[in-house]
Design a protein with these regions (language model features):
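HhH-family (HhH-GPD) DNA N-glycosylase catalytic core used in base-excision repair
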Residues: 4-311
Length: 311
């Protein structure tokens, strides 16, 4: 092979590893973000170590590992895969990292609105710059919403680990890329029952995965659709009620004005923030969240944070 052909061959090869930097805003709350990403110390998809974290992702069809060092004003990222990465791997990794770190929206308008109200300003005290942290992709957000229905966070973590172990894909570094719709669609309800899934939860999760595989629920299209259309599409899916729909809209699609009414963390956060003698019912939750519009997703994330590790 002559030198020109060798040069062309090398240029045509797709890398298995690449690095890039992502600019972070001033006073980015890195420690708080790392705390959120590391809530499950036994996670099979993410690991936090000091000021760094690693997470299993899908880049194209390739299970990959993204290692990220959070430094002042920058996130240094290294993407690694067991096979060759697609040509747009860096763009995909940047997009997913931006979602994970909450960089797709600016907190300033929400914070200005809070600071203008003496009653609401305490919500952001000590948490200026806090973000809406999204899931790496929309299906992961859907999975979290279904797993988290009517159970506490610790058990939701347990169910997700079992699901990842069964339907996720090994990535470098000993972590897994999360389950994709096709893998979940191949599961049977009876199998998930052995993992302590309720029958309904198993049916809902497998059912939504099969709808996605069949093209009946297009998550890519919903990513650019208006909020009303997204909510209607989600509510049409068996197993997704108003709480699940708003959770998915917030964490999977990044909508800024969602209220996951009935969420246990939201209920406890509202009771704590407003010093209520009793936990608010659904109507009271909507009324209490009204002053935070049109930034109720932001308020929800802050209310969760008031609970510390409980949320």
């Amino acid at each position: 092979m002559d030198r020109c052909r060798i040069f062309r061959y090398i240029r045509a090869m797709k890398p298995r590893r690449l690095s890039f930097d992502l600019k972070l805003p001033a006073a980015y709350p890195a420690a708080r973000v790392l705390g959120y990403l590391g809530r499950d110390p036994k996670s099979l998809t993410a690991r936090v170590d000091g000021e760094s974290f690693a997470i299993g992702l899908w880049i194209g069809g390739v299970p990959s590992l993204l290692r990220v060092d959070l430094a002042p004003k920058r996130a240094g990222a290294t993407l690694e895969a067991g096979s060759r990465l697609p040509a747009d791997a860096e763009d995909q990794a940047r997009d997913q990292l931006g979602r994970l770190l909450g960089l797709n929206h600016d907190p300033a308008p929400f914070e200005r609105q809070m600071l203008a109200s003496p009653k609401l300003a305490p919500l952001i005290a000590g948490r200026r710059g806090w973000r809406i942290l999204q899931t790496p992709d929309a299906f992961d957000g859907l999975t979290w919403a279904i797993l988290g229905q009517q159970i506490n966070l610790a058990f939701a973590f347990t169910l997700r680990r079992r699901l990842v172990e069964r339907a996720g894909s090994p990535a470098p570094g000993g972590l897994f890329a999360p389950p994709r719709p096709a893998a979940v669609a191949e599961l049977e309800v009876e199998e998930l029952l052995t993992f302590q899934f309720s029958r309904r939860k198993a049916e809902y999760l497998i059912g939504v995965a099969r709808r996605i595989v069949a093209g009946e629920l297009d998550l890519d299209r919903l990513a650019t659709a208006p909020a009303e259309e997204v909510e209607a599409a989600l509510l049409a899916v068996r197993g997704l009620g108003p709480w699940s729909a708003h959770y998915v809209m917030m964490r999977a699609f990044g909508f800024e004005d969602c209220v996951p009414v009935g969420d246990s963390g939201l209920v406890r956060g509202l009771a704590k923030f407003f010093s209520l003698a009793e936990r608010p019912d659904a109507a009271a939750q909507r009324e209490l969240m009204r002053p935070f519009a049109p930034y109720r997703s932001w308020a929800t994330f802050h209310l969760w944070q008031t609970l510390g590790d409980e949320a």
